[in-house]
Amino acid sequence: MEMDSHNAKPLRILLSNDDGVHAQGIHALADELRSIAEVTIVAPDRNRSGASNSLTLEQPLRVTEIAPKTFSVQGTPTDCVHFALNELMKDDLPDLVLSGINHGANLGDDVLYSGTVAAAMEGHFLGVQAIAFSLVGKQHFESAAKIARQLVEQHLIRPIPTNRLLNVNVPDLPFEELGEIEVTRLGARHHAENMIKQRDPRGHDIYWLGPPGKEQDAGIGTDFYAIEHGFVSITPLQVDLTAHESLRAMDSWLKEEN
């Protein structure tokens, strides 16, 4: 394991995800990073895709160490990182929180629903540099893992120049076929398609969420555009959802006489 030259201590990385502790993506990421870092996995006990930033509030979290430095949590991705940073690793916080590798894209509006992004966001909330990784497919996890290692190694030489959360999407291609890493903004989708109504065996109506909406804003500079053209997309995200440009207009609107 290589050492962090700044403090002569091993680089320490916390991994989480929303696909579950047994998912292929998180283990591909761990395998790639273990030669340069001390890796701890804290991830949900099952698939929690779409959990966003939800926390478990009405019941306790049950945590099981299923392998050395690998913990399964009966909770959401945000629960996992919250537990790891506020309990498991509280006396010696990790240097990085990495989430993923997600089994599918997190582009545009996807980030609002993504448990993968939420896990990284919780790390950011709690003061640790965090990056979310997603593979736009389910085959070439080793490509995304190599991109992750590349970014981590670059961070060790020149720290990431922002305290923003980073969202990385990697095309589902062999590593040697990937384009360059492009800094992008989030694109946008049309709203999701209609719900799918079915009947269960007992005659009750059941509903499935429809497919995600098609791309609405996928122009040059967006994450959608980068992926479509074979580039790796990296998007800095901020947690502040305030629409600052609307503050003055809203203030004037409220003060207008009817």
UniProtKB/Swiss-Prot annotation:
Keywords: Cytoplasm, Hydrolase, Metal-binding, Nucleotide-binding. One of its GO terms (cellular component) is cytoplasm. Pfam families: SurE. Its main location: cytoplasm. The keyword Zinc-finger does not apply. It is an enzyme of class 3 (hydrolase). One of its GO terms (molecular function) is metal ion binding. It is found in: Cytoplasm. A divalent metal cation binds at D18, D19, S49, N102. Its EC number is 3.1.3.5. It catalyses: a ribonucleoside 5'-phosphate + H2O = a ribonucleoside + phosphate. Signal peptide: none annotated. Gene3D superfamilies: Survival protein SurE-like phosphatase/nucleotidase. Binds 1 divalent metal cation per subunit. Belongs to the SurE nucleotidase family. Nucleotidase that shows phosphatase activity on nucleoside 5'-monophosphates. This is 5'-nucleotidase SurE. It comes from Vibrio campbellii (strain ATCC BAA-1116).
